[in-house]
Swiss-Prot record:
Lineage: Bacteria, Pseudomonadati, Pseudomonadota, Gammaproteobacteria, Legionellales
Binding site for ATP: G375, H376, S377, G378, S379, G380, K381, T382
Official protein name in the record: ATP-dependent lipid A-core flippase
Organism encoding this protein: Legionella pneumophila (strain Paris)
Primary location group: membrane
Domain ABC transporter: 342-576
Record flagged with keyword Glycoprotein: no
């Protein structure tokens, strides 16, 4: 699913401009302001000739008296158009970044689950924050500097040609050499910029993992290891940044050297060809001033090239992400709740074209009944639970909901029918009320409280200083494991979907809490089709059907008592837990 093919610069520019196009009126105003700014600068250079010639050679007192007014008007106008141009270009850039960030985030949210299995949160954050910001530099700072300086270069060259085209042509001979230097550094900076982006993703990833897993890091004494790993990543990032800096230095120094040679050639020509080329002192000094002024914009343009290449590398990374296919979301839209009858027909599944995890899985869950999945680790329990809401697409076979293949239903319609409570509870840095009402944003406070009571969460919520308006911190860090689990259960209760998936839903609770939650879940499960994955077999004894999986195949199925009477795989697992025997090979 990864797309790392290089995109040609022309296509990148064209695609990037499609994001700029909606803001073209402001962009045009900014471009015109920057052109006027450069024109004023070039005009001042031309005025140098007039100032010198009419002030000291052919004295023109009327013109001399106007010089202060010309300077005042020119500098004032220059300042105004500079501010206007800068504001317009920055406005366009930040608008592009806003749209691009929103587009990237929306795309990431709708990517298939198997993309998340490979990509890390650090890499994704780096794309949203760092790579998109590089694009901003292309569409704002780089574009502003490019327009200002390229117009200034054109203006100064025009001034030189008007004053003395013969000497100006000599200077133009240096342009091809400047092009050779810029072309070399272009390729080098673009290549290194890809490495910089990759290392930024690694730095973000390492920091994110260490911060999120700080308890494990500390209890296992991994501080030095994490610091060393982070330092290595930042050092590698620094080295790549220095490679870019070296390329910039070579670029700038080379261009300055070429320009210096050009200036020296013109001075020599003016001295040795004085009998052929007639030029006034003012004209000669104006040409020299123009050439000296050319150094700064030429230097900026060559330095700017590195910024543009970094921005294009960032754009390439972002567009590669945007080119990844989204979840297939075409199908029927269900207007009403389903009854909840689920059937797996000859289901096979493999992750990323690897070996099959599931082999010819067949079973039926009658509407309103509960089915529990048990088996060794890696037997396919979680895979089955993930296939039902189409987190992954089937490799082979069919899953039906009320007789309709789930592939023929829209994802939104299908997932509206399902609630999920998993072992790894996800809470957002928001209030308890908003966490319970996640996905049901129109729920009233009374409905939220009712759901919390059914999940036995209302009691501890009332004891908090702000009650239901208490913020839970990042991923519910301010709550205990049992409290987080109860909030997740309350969220599922409030959704009131006809299908319920319980993936180790009571694993994080103490015995007393589990007793109450189990009672609450039994009430919630009534009338709902429930798929249960549980570690403790004692919690699934009352399931209508228990399915035993081994190596992706169904080896037994029946009620709790029926499976005990078979004295097979399930009976062995149950006895191990019932009598507290330790068997490391058995993980249910």
């Amino acid at each position: 699913m990864k797309n790392n093919l290089p995109i040609k610069s022309r296509l990148l520019y064209k695609r990037l401009l499609s994001y700029v196009k909606p803001f073209w009126p402001v962009l045009l105003l900014g471009v015109l302001a920057n052109i006027l700014y450069s024109g004023i600068d070039a005009g001042f250079t031309y005025m140098t000739k007039l100032f010198l010639d009419k002030s000291f050679i052919t004295i023109d007192l009327d013109f001399v008296k106007q010089i202060p007014l010309i300077v005042l008007i020119g500098i004032t106008l220059r300042g105004l158009v500079s501010s206007l141009g800068s504001y317009c270009m920055t406005w366009v850039a930040r608008s592009v970044v806003k749209v691009l960030r929103q587009t990237v985030f929306s795309h990431i949210i709708h990517l298939p689950a198997d993309y998340y299995d490979e990509a890390t949160s650090g890499q994704l954050l780096s794309k949203i924050l760092y790579d998109v910001e590089q694009v901003a530099q292309v569409s704002a700072d780089a574009l502003t500097d490019f327009i200002q300086n390229i117009c200034l270069v054109i203006g100064l060259l025009t001034v030189m040609m008007v004053i003395c085209w013969q000497l100006s042509l000599m200077f133009l001979l240096t342009i091809p050499f400047v092009g050779i230097i810029v072309n070399y550094t272009n390729k080098r900076v673009r290549r290194i910029s890809h490495k910089v982006q990759k290392t930024m993703g690694e730095v973000t990833e390492i920091a994110s993992e260490a911060i999120e897993g700080y308890r494990v890091v500390r209890i296992f004494g991994g501080e030095r290891y994490e610091i060393t790993k982070f330092n290595k990543a930042t050092e590698y990032s620094r080295k790549n940044d220095m490679k870019v800096a070296i390329s910039k230095a070579i670029n700038v120094s080379g261009v300055q050297l070429v320009i210096a040679i050009g200036i020296a050639m013109i001075i020599m020509a003016a001295i040795h060809l004085s009998t052929v080329i007639t030029i006034s002192a003012g004209s000669f000094l104006a040409i020299i001033a123009a050439m000296l002024q050319l150094i700064k914009p030429m230097k900026t343009l060559t330095t700017l090239n590195a910024t543009i290449q970094r921005g294009l590398a960032g754009a390439e990374s972002v567009f590669n992400l945007l080119d990844l296919p989204l979840e297939r979301n075409n199908g029927l839209i269900l207007k009403e709740k389903v009854r909840g009858e689920i059937e797996f027909k000859h289901v096979y599944h493999a992750y990323r074209q690897s070996q099959n995890i599931l082999h010819d899985v067949n079973f039926v869950i009658e509407a309103g009944t509960s089915v529990a999945l048990v088996g060794h680790s890696g037997s396919g329990k979680t895979t089955i639970a993930s296939l039902l809401p189409r987190f992954y697409e089937l490799s082979q076979g069919m899953i039906t909901l009320d007789g309709m293949p789930i592939q023929q239903l829209s994802l939104e319609s299908l997932r509206k029918q399902i609630s999920l409570v998993s072992q790894n509870v996800t809470l957002f840095n928001d209030t308890l009320a908003n966490n319970i009402a996640y996905g049901r944003f129109d729920a009233s406070r009374e409905q939220i409280i009712t759901a919390a009571k059914l999940a036995y969460a209302d009691e501890f919520i009332k004891q908090l200083p702000d009650g239901y308006d208490t913020r839970v911190g990042e991923n519910g860090v301010l709550l205990s494991g049992g409290q987080r689990q109860r909030i997740a259960i309350a969220r599922a209760i409030l959704k009131d979907a006809p299908i319920l998936i319980l993936d180790e839903a009571t694993s994080a609770l103490d015995s007393e809490s589990e007793h109450y939650i189990q009672a609450a879940l039994e009430q919630v499960m009534k009338g709902r089709t429930t798929l249960i994955i549980a570690h403790r077999l004692s919690t699934i004894k009352h399931a209508h059907k228990i399915i035993v999986l081994q190596h992706g195949r169904i080896v037994e199925q029946g009620s709790h008592q029926e499976l005990l009477d078979m004295d097979g795989h399930y009976a062995q697992l149950y006895k191990v837990q019932q009598f507290g025997r330790i068997n490391e090979e058995v993980v249910v």
